[in-house]
């Protein structure tokens, strides 16, 4: 065990934990004032439910002894055998239970990200059931495929440094499925974010926490971690700039929300690649990611007519997909000897492996998410009724208001 690495991972874990409250602010500022508490409750509920699920079965299903490359066994049920003694399969320099806690923060954040797609219209009780089932049936298997010892995508050689597939594609695609299943919100013409300073503050906390998310995925304070640190920042900066420039060109003015969404999109795009590419490649990945995610939010969503409330798919699904492809293009063993060279360094096979991983994640997530929400809806209506939606979910679902001084309802 290395004390320096252990302290480093303690700090990284706490930083990633901060991302979920940051996401609550980021999403909360974008919805109408009558739905801000219900939106933030989604993130905090994920912290509670997934923490318990992870301790009981989730960690074992994700990282436990392999079963046919598909999922972990329940040998580590209730953290049986998961102690402070390092597990060299994952890291020989930090306690095994610290690695478990670091990965828990990823598992918490992922279903919270999904909630942006169906904000303002999903019944809270249905959401709680969905979190538990989705984490168990979708997140845990995909995490094992990509990161677990023996997982089939790991054995294939697909690369995902910090969760492009595991976190962002799964959450973005699941969000799209739910947005389509629940249908559009009522009376949304002319609505606007109720508190953009919340969103800007949330974006700042996400940017800060993302250093723990990406850099901590090195699991050691080494040269790869420092490269991931640089790459994370430059990709966010480049994406924020290209999103703003895209807004300026297509909509006449750059906006504060555009800057925030652009930064987050760049952070998403660099997530799978941050420990495998050079800083200049990270700049390109972020810059292109900003343009692609802007296009998904302002053109793709309009063309197909789905109501992805806070653009979970546009930012996370598209950003994660681009990041996975970009890893297959820009990865180089000069940055990380444990990785592989991508297409631009003479190895077309890596790009093929990345595409297989992305395709498998899309297919599995779409099928399982639809099955889960369809099953829940059979027993419990997942969408609030029209009166509850008009009243606002803060009152109809939670019996409280964020702002007692205002009577405005839009």
Task: Label each residue range with its predicted role.
Residues 1-410:
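Glycine- and aromatic-enriched membrane alpha-helices
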């Amino acid at each position: 065990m290395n004390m320096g690495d252990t302290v480093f991972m303690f700090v990284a874990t706490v930083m990633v934990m901060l991302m979920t409250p940051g996401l609550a602010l980021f999403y909360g500022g974008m919805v109408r004032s009558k739905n801000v508490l219900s939106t933030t409750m989604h993130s905090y509920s994920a912290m509670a439910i997934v923490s318990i699920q992870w301790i009981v079965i989730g960690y074992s299903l994700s990282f436990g002894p392999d079963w046919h490359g598909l999922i972990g066994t329940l040998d580590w049920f209730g953290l049986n055998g998961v102690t402070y003694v390092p597990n060299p399969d994952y890291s020989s320099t930090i306690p095994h239970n610290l690695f478990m806690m670091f990965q828990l923060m990823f598992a918490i954040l992922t279903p919270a990200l999904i909630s942006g797609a169906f904000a303002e219209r999903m019944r809270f009780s249905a959401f709680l059931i969905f979190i538990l089932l989705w984490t168990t049936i979708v997140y845990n298997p995909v995490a094992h495929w990509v990161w677990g010892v023996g997982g089939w995508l790991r054995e294939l050689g697909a690369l995902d440094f910090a969760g492009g597939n595991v976190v962002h594609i799964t959450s973005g695609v699941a969000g799209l499925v739910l947005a389509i299943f629940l249908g559009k919100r009522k009376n949304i013409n002319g609505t606007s974010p109720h508190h953009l300073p919340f969103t800007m503050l949330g974006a700042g906390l996400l940017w800060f926490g993302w250093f723990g998310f990406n850099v901590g995925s090195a699991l050691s304070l080494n040269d790869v971690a420092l490269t991931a640190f640089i790459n994370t920042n430059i990709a966010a900066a480049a994406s924020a700039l290209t999103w703003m420039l895209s807004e300026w060109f297509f909509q006449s003015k750059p906006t504060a929300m555009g800057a925030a969404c652009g930064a987050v999109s760049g952070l998403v795009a660099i997530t799978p690649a941050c420990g495998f590419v050079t800083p200049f490649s990270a700049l390109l990945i972020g810059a292109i990611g900003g343009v692609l995610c802007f296009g998904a939010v302002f053109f793709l969503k309009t063309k197909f007519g789905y109501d992805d409330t806070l653009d979970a798919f546009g930012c996370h699904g598209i950003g994660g997909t681009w990041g996975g492809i970009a890893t297959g293009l820009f990865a180089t063993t000069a940055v990380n000897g444990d990785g592989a060279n991508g297409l631009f360094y003479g190895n077309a096979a890596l790009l093929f492996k990345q595409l297989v991983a992305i395709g498998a994640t899309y297919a599995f997530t779409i099928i399982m998410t639809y099955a889960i929400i369809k099953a829940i809806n059979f027993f419990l209506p997942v969408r609030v009724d029209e009166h509850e939606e008009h009243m606002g979910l803060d009152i109809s679902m939670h019996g409280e208001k964020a702002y007692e001084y205002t009577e405005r309802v839009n």
